[in-house]
Amino acid sequence: MIMDYNRAVKDLNGMSKEDFLAKVCEIFDVSEIEHAADQSEEQLRPKQKGEYSMFLGEKWYLCRLKEADKNPDPVKGLDVSLLQDLLLDPVLGIKDPKTDDRIDFIGGIRGLKELERRVHTDCAVAFAMYPTSIGELFAVADAGLLMPPKSTWFEPKLRSGLFIHEIRQEDTNDSSR
């Protein structure tokens, strides 16, 4: 199963929470999730492609991609790419998520409570992603392109060495196989 691969960012690039939220509202349709503390993690998660749940301060917000920002390109149209291209790079200054120390990636199996914990300890904002679909994964592969970093979290994890078969000398000399 493909699960979400969430993001936590250590700072707001010099902005206050209010200024950052205003920037987010310019990019997404944003609504505060009322009574978030009383809701289950499932209720706080994004429900469809183009939605992100954001934890900022002590509040959860649902951020919906505006129609004009949707992209038919198999890689640029992925939710992880859109978040990177529309918000993380231009607003938070995270040019390369592979090398920038200000962003951390949290596998979906760890849950939204881990995102809250990170914002309460060492991060300023966290984003819960809608999981990349198998169809999106195949579309990227069929186009001969590469998935963005940290865009998929697979469960269950395959055990290391599960598909390794030892080749012994006698195996290569045995022509009866």
Regions found by a protein language model. Give the residues of each.
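Surface-exposed, charge/polar-rich loops and edge strands
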Residues: 1-177
